[in-house]
Amino acid sequence: MAQIRSKPFGVTKQGANVTEYILSNPGGLTVSVLDYGCIIKNIIVPAKNGPVDVVLGHDTMADYEDDFTSSGSTCCGAFVGRYANRIENATFSVGGKTYQLEANNGPNHLHGCFSRKLYRVKAFGDTLLMEAESPDGEDGFPGNLKLAVRYTLTEDNTFRMDYRVSSDADTIVNLTNHSYFNLNGDPSKEGTNMWLYLNADNYTPADSTYMTTGEIRSVEGTPMDFRKAHALEETINDTSFDQIRNATGYDHNWCLNTYKNGKGDDTKVCAVLWSPVTKIGLSMYTNEPGVQVYTGNFQGTGVSCKHGIKYPKHVSVCLESQKYPDSPNKPNWPSPYLKPGEKYYSHVAYRFWTGEFGIDK
């Protein structure tokens, strides 16, 4: 059974104390979570040559705040919403009304403000529960929301996140975690040697503003095909393909084969990331219809991050469980709508292991 301890992490610019909660299991896996933004600060995985911290991040509270309040916020390790990913022209309609959101990513709305909230915490057994509210009108969204994020670390080295939301008005919800994974143990170098597997026959192409076009395309015969695992470096620089050229890497949603008839099968692997250096693997499971794969295309800015390291471009991979981007404006896609009396429920699990590559390790 996992143990949970805590320690002070820092103070926000508004004077609020921030606490770091550390979950550890008997096998040596350790996960650190902050009550600011529900940030995953560290995931330390035992490996043959010693423990490896497999997520990017910052050393201080001030660094996280400077990042998250900048125009180029990375949301590094954070819980994001109300609507993870982009909403076209920062507008959508629900309940017969049209809502204008903050346009914080060019003309579009991206992610929202949940990464900048302070959460109330309860710890019991091997579980950490973080709760907060989102008032009606926050970022322009309707409805008063009650948020609950539950973190669980199991003895088989699975780290699971469960999200639950209720609303008192018709609204939309799409939540995810924005951790940046580098399984190599050296985030001072590119991570494109990591292997990726995606259980997905289709993806949603995006335009030059990273907005989904409304199409669903087959991955067959394109650099988007990860049904047979391969190193990212084999395809990430293929600028003859417009999707990679526009994004300077991968920043796309894949339509998971594990989601059928309106339900996700979280007993089946939807994605695997693996390092040929440390032999650390990550197997992902979710009930969501999509996964956003982002390869750190906007990293390499020269900003010093965790341990003073300046991360290069393509140093990491985000695997973000989600509804498809801009689903509120794409009526044929899986629904992001939430009504009063209903419960939004989403979860994702990352299972860590070591050894040679395998899909069902």
Annotate each predicted stretch with a short phrase:
Residues 2-361:
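An exposed, glycine/acidic-rich loop-and-rim segment of catalytic or binding clefts
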